[in-house]
Amino acid sequence: MEKEKGLLIVLSGPAGVGKGTVCSALRKHDTNIQYSVSATTRAPRKGEVDGVNYFFKSREQFEAMIEKEELLEWAEYVGNYYGTPIQYVRETIDSGKDIILEIEVQGALKVRERFPEGVFIFLMPPSLAELRSRIVGRGTETEEVINKRMNVAKEEIEMMKKYDYVVENDEVELAVDRIKAIVTAEHCKRERLIEKYHQLVEVE
């Protein structure tokens, strides 16, 4: 019988909404979910490790990856490139494991064009005031960049209608529980299983 493929789960939302925190907590709960490491040209933040948090690239290196079509998606956000290496994503799905992409809204919409069967989840902040507080709390951004991120966030929230699900990140554990419920339900969808069970009937 054909092995069930994994799901491509795309999680995105405004900067500061807590995508990274939710993804880390989700992986602790579900060992079948692999985390897709993105490539970026932004400078590493304190504690970030190349190849673990991101693949840190120069602009020249990143543009070479674009030219060779080695990225599932890519976008330029607040002056830096972000993108998803395609080979790792395909290999993970084919192995039967789910893979989660934590990416910006622009990138998520590009992935939707190429992988319409993916599961697209928009992570919402409880409020814009809370979102600003989280960004300020990082202590890594200037006031100018914070204001720019907030303006972009308002535009991104308008794009949530293009997603399959919206999850509010009021508390990390609650957000994780909601996403786990979504993933479980998606694995039970008829269209994902029909070929597998057609083969079962044919064998018998």
From Swiss-Prot:
**What are the entry keywords?**
ATP-binding, Cytoplasm, Kinase, Nucleotide-binding, Transferase
Q: Which GO terms describe its cellular component?
A: cytosol
Q: Quote the catalytic activity from the record.
A: GMP + ATP = GDP + ADP
Query: What Enzyme Commission number(s) apply to this enzyme?
Result: 2.7.4.8
Q: Output the PROSITE patterns linked to this UniProt entry.
A: GUANYLATE_KINASE_1, GUANYLATE_KINASE_2
Q: Which domain of life is it from?
A: Bacteria
Query: Which Gene3D superfamilies is this protein grouped with?
Result: Guanylate Kinase phosphate binding domain, P-loop containing nucleotide triphosphate hydrolases
Show the GO MF annotations: ATP binding; guanylate kinase activity
Keyword check for Transferase, yes or no: yes
Ranges in a coiled coil: none
Q: What class of enzyme is it?
A: transferase
Sites binding ATP sit at: 13-20
Q: Which HAMAP family match?
A: Guanylate_kinase (MF_00328)
**What family is it from?**
Belongs to the guanylate kinase family.
The family database entries (PANTHER family) matched by this protein are listed as:
GUANYLATE KINASE, GUANYLATE KINASE-RELATED
Can you say what this protein is called?
A: Guanylate kinase
- Source organism: Halalkalibacterium halodurans (strain ATCC BAA-125 / DSM 18197 / FERM 7344 / JCM 9153 / C-125) (Bacillus halodurans)
Gene coding for it: gmk
